[in-house]
C-alpha cells in the first residue's frame, strides 16, 4: 500500500488520456470495477466521461497520480450548456461514425452496446434553475486512492477554480446504486436536487452553491 505522501495532484495533460480512461473503466460499474462488463471495448465509458473534459476543459481537469500511475481524476465544466453544445458538434459525430448504433432488443444489449447507444442518443441534464448551478463536476478514484482525502482535495480545487471564474454553483450526478459516492458528495456540501429514474438506471442529481448568495 502506498503512503499518502506518494500521491500527487496535478493538472491533466493530453497524454493522460489512456490512464484516465483506465480509471473510468475500473470505476465504471456503479463505482466498482467495470472491466468484466466492457472487455470488448474498454474505452467505451471513457469516451464520454473523460475524453471531452480533457479536450474542452483542460484548465478544470486534475489528475491524481501515485508511483503505480494515474489513480484518479476530477473534471469540471464551467458552463454545462456550452460544454454539451461543443460535445454535440465536435465530439459526438466522431463517436457515431466509428461506433454504429446497436440493433435488436435493447433488453438483450451488453453494457458496451448500451454505451454505444448513448453515443447516438445522449441525455443531457441541466438543473433548474440553471443559473444557480451552471457548472458540473465529475470525479473517479481507484480503490487504492480512496479514503485518503485526495478526492475531497481535488473536488475543492476544481470548485475553487470554478468560483474564481465566476461560477455561482455546480451540480453532479450519482447513481442511485452508489451510496458511498452519495455520502461523499453530501459531506462536500452538495444537496439533492432531483431524482431521475430508478434502480440501475436511476440517477440522483445534486447541487452546491459556490458563492455566498
Which residues does each predicted region cover?
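Conserved N-terminal entry element of GNAT/NAT acetyltransferase domains
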Residues: 1-15, 212-213
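Conserved catalytic-core motifs of GNAT/GCN5-like acyltransferases
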Residues: 81, 171-174, 186-206
Amino acid at each position: 500500500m502506498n503512503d499518502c505522501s506518494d500521491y500527487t495532484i496535478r493538472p491533466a495533460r493530453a497524454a493522460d488520456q489512456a490512464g484516465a480512461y483506465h480509471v473510468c473503466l475500473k470505476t465504471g460499474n456503479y463505482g466498482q470495477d467495470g472491466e468484466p462488463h466492457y472487455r470488448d471495448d474498454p474505452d467505451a465509458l471513457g469516451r464520454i466521461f473523460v475524453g471531452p473534459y480533457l479536450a474542452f476543459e483542460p484548465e478544470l481537469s486534475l489528475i491524481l497520480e501515485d508511483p503505480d500511475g494515474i489513480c484518479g481524476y476530477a473534471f469540471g465544466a464551467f458552463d454545462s450548456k456550452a460544454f454539451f453544445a461543443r460535445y454535440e458538434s465536435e465530439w459526438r459525430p466522431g463517436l457515431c461514425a466509428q461506433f454504429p448504433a446497436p440493433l435488436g432488443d435493447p433488453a438483450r444489449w451488453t453494457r458496451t452496446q448500451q454505451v454505444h447507444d448513448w453515443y447516438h442518443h445522449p441525455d443531457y441534464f441541466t438543473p433548474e434553475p440553471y443559473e444557480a448551478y451552471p457548472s458540473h463536476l465529475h470525479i473517479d478514484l481507484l480503490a487504492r486512492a480512496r479514503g485518503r482525502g485526495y478526492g475531497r482535495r481535488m473536488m475543492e480545487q476544481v470548485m475553487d477554480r470554478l468560483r474564481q471564474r465566476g461560477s455561482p454553483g455546480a451540480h453532479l450526478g450519482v447513481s442511485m446504486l452508489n451510496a458511498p459516492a452519495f455520502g461523499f458528495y453530501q459531506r462536500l456540501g452538495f444537496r439533492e436536487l432531483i431524482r431521475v429514474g430508478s434502480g440501475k438506471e436511476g440517477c440522483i442529481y445534486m447541487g452546491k452553491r459556490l458563492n455566498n448568495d
